[in-house]
């Protein structure tokens, strides 16, 4: 090999060395997430989320927040509970297509409902979810959701029947919040349906229906 050939090979080696590296995807940051899609990507970094965090209309002015689904559920509030929920919505001229529906424990991750590490993380995810959706009205269903979202051991029976303000830690605009009996409670306690109907009428009144 002569000097010119050596220089040529050396030059080619340098070109290979300085070849730009492949772009590395950045991790999604929770607080910088500005859409539900980004929030789902954030959660997928640590957990196998196979379902959407939100069902229905993402930009609805009313967000119904459930507690946790059953493993066999194909949607948030399914089977008999889902049928009753649909009738409850219909009674005030609403349906799943024009409300926003979320579950505190995302569907498909029900087995993590008592995992302390997950619960710490999902609390902040749900706060951010509320901030992104930014509903005018927040309707909380289930004692589990009350305990986790409102940080209280009071039951739906104690909290229903009135409006109150709810703020996430980073939210400056309070949401008008109300507790509504979850369908399963109404199925097991039909005598509570009268109270639920009064709550539904109040929700309809606020929505201008």
Name every feature range the model reports, one short phrase each.
Residues 2-209:
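A polyanion-binding, active-site-adjacent surface
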């Amino acid at each position: 090999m002569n000097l010119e050939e050596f220089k040529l090979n050396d030059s080619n080696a340098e070109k290979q060395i300085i070849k730009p590296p492949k772009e590395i995807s950045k991790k999604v940051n929770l607080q910088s997430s500005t859409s539900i899609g980004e929030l789902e990507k954030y959660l997928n970094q640590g957990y196998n989320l196979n379902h959407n965090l939100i069902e229905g209309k993402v930009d609805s002015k009313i967000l119904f927040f459930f507690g946790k689904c059953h493993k066999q559920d194909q949607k948030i509030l399914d089977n008999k509970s889902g049928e009753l929920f649909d009738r409850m919505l219909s009674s005030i001229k609403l349906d799943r297509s024009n409300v926003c529906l979320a579950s505190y424990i995302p569907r498909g991750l029900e087995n993590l409902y008592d995992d302390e590490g997950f619960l710490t993380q999902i609390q902040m995810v749900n706060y951010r979810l509320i901030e992104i959706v930014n509903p005018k009205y927040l309707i909380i269903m289930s004692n589990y959701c009350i305990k986790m979202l409102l940080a209280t051991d009071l039951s739906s029976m104690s909290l229903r029947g009135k409006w109150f303000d709810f703020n996430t830690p980073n939210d400056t605009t309070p949401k008008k919040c109300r507790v509504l009996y979850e369908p399963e409670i109404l199925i097991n306690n039909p005598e509570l349906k009268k109270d639920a109907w009064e709550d539904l009428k109040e929700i309809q009144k606020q929505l201008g229906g």
